[in-house]
Amino acid sequence: MTVASTVSQEILNHCLAIEGQRRLQGVLKVSGAKNSALVLMTASLLTEELVELINVPNLTDIAGMGRILSALGVQVEHSGNGVALNAGNLTSHEPPYELVNSLRASFFCIGSLLGRLGHARVPLPGGCRIGARPVVEHIRGLKALGAHVSVEHGIVSACVKGSKKRLTGAPIVLDCPSVGATETLLMAAVLATGTTTIENAAHEPEVQDLANLLIQMGADISGAGGPVITIHGVERLAGVSNYPVIPDRIEAGTFLIAAAITRSPLRVEPVIPEHLSAVLQKLRDCGCQLEIDQTGISITPGDIQAVDITTQPFPGFPTDLQAPFMALMATAQGTSVISEKIYENRLQHVAELQRMGASIRVDGSTAIVEGVAQLSAAPVTGSDLRAAAAMVLAGLAANGTTKVSGLKHLYRGYDKVEAKLNAVGAQLERQQG
């Protein structure tokens, strides 16, 4: 199955049956980063030339982005783990609502369309329903660059007045280091006249990956990965061949937690350790031995002890690994305190872990987890992407066969997850729900 393929509607009626307490051994391969690949695909809108990406994961979200870009007139061709995008003949500046509604990353199109064409109409985004996740910062930044922006009936309309249809560089100070706003404004600014600075910019590796791609395309960008990004606008961008998407740090972290929760020695590769520093430290703190080299990480779990975590913007502990790490802490010795500081309403997985025997109580955006000796198999549902991953991890550790529903969420972010885990000794089988 190629990245052009989408997982069948059959997954809505299926579940994953997971036989727990199997010891794992071997190497888990990490795919390209979903959150990077999605925004890199939208960057293809900034040039009339061919953009080729490699190490692209095979996910429903990637297929969805391909459909959105195709609807705008982009020629999208998938081959293996590569995707070629040619936006030389755009036919629309408004992605269809029915496609955008299911994918939050679709909103990135507004920055690249506005930068290239001088106008765009983009529906407010969909995706996992985690808290408010507003786009206020994106819009405020686009206005600072000279765009006229209005929101009506769920559609964001933006345009640049004047004959040249080009944005104008400006200083922008974000109220918070939003990844989405940073990436949207970065793409909008690369073709603007003059110089743009983005202060309080997001530091995430995915932002750095986008900047690196744009630089290879001819953009003049400095400071990506730090608090201030400077963009000197250029007249045009060129294409790029075989640009590799960075490894998915969230998938890598999930696999390391899979080793810890099953008390199994595993190797996870490829990994860029600097992208997971906070997670690696917490794994060490809770009793795991890590050996890190240039290509990956070997993990040997010991007796897992409770540790506290607080989600923070990069380089802090990532919110996307909060639910998976909570599953691990549910099996630890002692009591851990897990505080979610990035998104509201991101503790929906607690009730499902409790169904499996986890001892957890919630106080606002904080969960207090008292480790238990054994989780028990139960029918559970992943309410969002990372909650679904947490259910899979809990199922790997539980006594009995756990059935996890909500696979439409899981396949949005984990490439060939059953095959990868089964290859190291797990037993996962998709069944009729």
Swiss-Prot record:
One of its GO terms (molecular function) is UDP-N-acetylglucosamine 1-carboxyvinyltransferase activity. The keyword Cytoplasm applies. UDP-N-acetyl-alpha-D-glucosamine binds at residues 104, 320, 342. The active site is at 128 (proton donor). Gene3D superfamilies: Enolpyruvate transferase domain (3.65.10.10). Pathway: Cell wall biogenesis; peptidoglycan biosynthesis. This is UDP-N-acetylglucosamine 1-carboxyvinyltransferase. GO terms for biological process: cell division; cell wall organization; peptidoglycan biosynthetic process; regulation of cell shape; UDP-N-acetylgalactosamine biosynthetic process. It comes from Parasynechococcus marenigrum (strain WH8102). The modification 2-(S-cysteinyl)pyruvic acid O-phosphothioketal is found at residue 128. Cell wall formation. Adds enolpyruvyl to UDP-N-acetylglucosamine. GO terms for cellular component: cytoplasm. InterPro entries: Enolpyruvate_Tfrase_dom, Enolpyruvate_Tfrase_sf, MurA_subfamily, RNA3'P_cycl/enolpyr_Trfase_a/b, UDP_GlcNAc_COvinyl_MurA. It is an enzyme of class 2 (transferase). Phosphoenolpyruvate binds at residues 34-35. Its EC number is 2.5.1.7. Belongs to the EPSP synthase family. MurA subfamily. It is found in: Cytoplasm. It catalyses: phosphoenolpyruvate + UDP-N-acetyl-alpha-D-glucosamine = UDP-N-acetyl-3-O-(1-carboxyvinyl)-alpha-D-glucosamine + phosphate. Keywords: Cell cycle, Cell division, Cell shape, Cell wall biogenesis/degradation, Cytoplasm, Peptidoglycan synthesis, Pyruvate, Transferase.
